[in-house]
Design a protein with these regions (language model features):
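Short, Lys/Arg-rich, polar N-terminal cytosolic tail immediately upstream
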Residues: 1-17
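N-terminal signal-anchor transmembrane alpha helix
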Residues: 20-59
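Membrane-interfacial loop-to-transmembrane alpha-helix junctions, especially the N-terminal start
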Residues: 22, 129-142
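Interfacial helix-loop-helix junctions of multi-pass membrane proteins
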Residues: 41-50, 147-168
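Long, glycine/tryptophan/cysteine-rich extracytoplasmic
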Residues: 51-82
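Short aromatic-rich membrane-water interface segments that cap or initiate transmembrane helices
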Residues: 59-62, 93-105, 161-174
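Individual transmembrane alpha-helix segments
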Residues: 74-114
């Protein structure tokens, strides 16, 4: 009987490792997509279109004309509008807003795609021994990446309408560290 029990336990462990491997591989793909979205956001000049940071309440885009006008007015008060996009209309603003919004939304989805399965794996005791702390630290690093992103954007909301290249390098470098882990 102990041999059967050991075999069943080994099969359960093997299955758990498959779940974890599949989850981590999926996360690597999602992080790679995030880096591409970030690059498109940068190349389209969209990164400074959202001048406020609302990590919890900013999940939904403006849903009516009044809200669109509110966020556009905030953008028009920014140095980027005055220096690079003076005269841009609301339709043009919506175009650049999309990429920054999508970048932030994808970040939130990454947090859920990592955090919820991690919680399930922890509760069902399917996390390999010694990895619970590592995975939790990785989740925290992902959240911190959002803070780094805002820190980077904030650097471009000053007199010079351009983000700090050093902060941009930290943001991209952190993304690559997350991908590699």
């Amino acid at each position: 009987m102990p041999a059967v029990s050991a075999r069943l336990s080994a099969n359960a462990t093997s299955q758990s490792q498959k779940y974890v491997a599949f989850w981590l591989f999926g996360m690597a793909i999602l992080v790679a997509i995030m880096v591409v979205i970030g690059g498109v956001t940068r190349l389209t000049g969209s990164g400074l279109s959202m001048v406020e940071w609302r990590p919890l309440m900013g999940t939904l885009p403006p849903l009516n004309a009044a809200e669109w006008q509110r966020v556009f007015d905030l953008y028009r008060a920014s140095p980027e509008y005055d220096q690079l996009n003076y005269g841009m209309d609301l339709a043009g603003f919506k175009g650049i807003f999309f990429w920054e919004y999508f970048h932030r939304l994808w970040g939130r989805l990454l947090g859920l795609a990592f955090g919820l399965p991690l919680l399930v794996l922890l509760l069902t005791r399917r996390v390999p021994p010694g990895y619970a702390g590592r995975f939790t630290a990785l989740l925290c690093l992902g959240g911190f990446q959002g803070v780094i992103g805002w820190w980077m954007v904030k650097s471009g909301l000053t007199e010079v309408a351009s983000v700090s290249q050093y902060r941009l390098a930290v943001h991209l470098g952190t993304a690559l560290v997350i991908f590699s882990l």
